Structure formats: structure tokens, C-alpha cells
């Protein structure tokens, strides 16, 4: 799950910086606020989704995008949290999640090593004892060549934690290569159509 509202993730503005410019996007020419308003998971759906997952023997957790989302998710007894790539430098959010004492997964898309050091340090200093990083190439779809799978062992060595892959490629080859290089978590992005 992803937990946010359009108002907590962007401004309801029509300026050039708030319009989607990617001509290949289904959302081309539309506002970011409109996209997030239409794409968000309604908060009242979270509990039924979590219950359904539990009944199927799966753990369900969420990516909060702001501190209020963490408060809401804590009311649902969220078992773990994922920090999305766009939020991996949002240190107050990382601090708030870490303070829950729950496991945290941080996606690393677009972050520099220095930014990741800050995020990992904040998580650990704020109480996170179970931390994992996901190697992530923030493009959809990502090409296997640009997925930089060989950095997985290096990340494990640098940060002393579990490392996995947030896989945006077509097919399963990148995930297999990631596991062969020591990945312990695979997050696979896919569509059913």
C-alpha cells in the first residue's frame, strides 16, 4: 500500500512545475494533484486490504508519505514500513517511522551514497533495529542494463544491512540476477494488463 492524500504530497497548483510533461504518460498534460487525487488508496480501504492479506497468510504493509500517515498506520498496527524512493531524503518521516520500532525498508532510487548514509543514520539513531535497503532504478520500465545489480553486495558492505531489489524491469531476469548477487528481498512492479 501507499498512504498519502493528494494534499499531503503536492500542491493543488496549475503552474508548469505541477503539470506532467512526459508525452508517453497516460497522465500527460494533467496536474500532479489530479493524478494523486485519482491514484491514491482511500484510507478506509487500508484495514480491509490488510485483513484480506492476513486471511491469505500474507503480511501487508505500507509506504507512508508524511508523518500523519504514520500515525494513521500505527492505529492499524502496521507490521513494517517502506520508505519510497521519493521520500528517502525525508528525514523527519524516516525518524517518525524508526521511532515505531517496526522494520523499515528504504528504497534507494535517485539517492546519492551521502543521502543514503543520512537516511540510514537517521533510521538507526531513531530506533530502527531492522533495516533493509532496496536497490532501485527510478524509471518505468527500467532496462536491465541500467538496474546496476552489481551494486547490491557493495550496498550491503557499506550499510551493514539486508539489501534487495525494487525491480521495475520487464520479466524476471533482473530479480534472478539480484538474488544471485545476494539480494534478500525482491519487490516486483508489474501490471495485469
Kindly label every feature range from the protein language model.
Residues 1-193:
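Catalytic cores and adjacent flexible loops of soluble metabolic enzymes
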